[in-house]
């Protein structure tokens, strides 16, 4: 049985492999600053995709962990993205999207769900 760190790493690798098969290039993985960590940052055709990966084995009420993605978490994530952009100025002119990849466990399940996080306003997080 995997611990939570193992589940998270496994989920990130699964999502990364899928994105790479679709032509996305890895820019950063587990990039961190004082505001938090960005699980995956990938790029394709002037688009940057920041991916928050949630791996869960539970099928309870909040089996995706969406309740943990509250306003405070969103604000920290926006600030972390702002820090990432400050250290990666090459990508400042790219379009930027934030998505959550929902990875079910056990690994035998083949489906991934994606949630696009709208209203990505980096300036509001300053």
UniProtKB/Swiss-Prot annotation:
GO molecular function per UniProt: nucleic acid binding
Source domain of life: Bacteria
Family the UniProt entry places it in: Belongs to the UPF0102 family.
Protein name: UPF0102 protein PMT_0624
Organism (species): Prochlorococcus marinus (strain MIT 9313)
């Amino acid at each position: 049985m995997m611990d939570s760190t193992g589940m998270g790493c496994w989920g990130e690798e699964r999502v990364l492999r899928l994105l790479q098969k679709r032509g996305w290039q890895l820019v950063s993985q587990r990039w961190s600053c004082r505001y938090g960590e960005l699980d995956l940052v990938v790029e394709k055709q002037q688009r940057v995709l920041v991916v928050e990966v949630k791996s869960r084995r539970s099928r309870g009420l909040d089996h995706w962990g969406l309740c943990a993605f509250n306003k405070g978490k969103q604000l920290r994530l926006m600030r972390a993205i702002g820090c990432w952009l400050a250290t990666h100025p090459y990508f400042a002119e790219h379009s930027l999207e934030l998505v959550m990849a929902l990875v079910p466990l056990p690994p035998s399940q083949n489906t991934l769900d994606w949630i696009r996080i709208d209203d990505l306003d980096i300036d509001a997080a300053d």
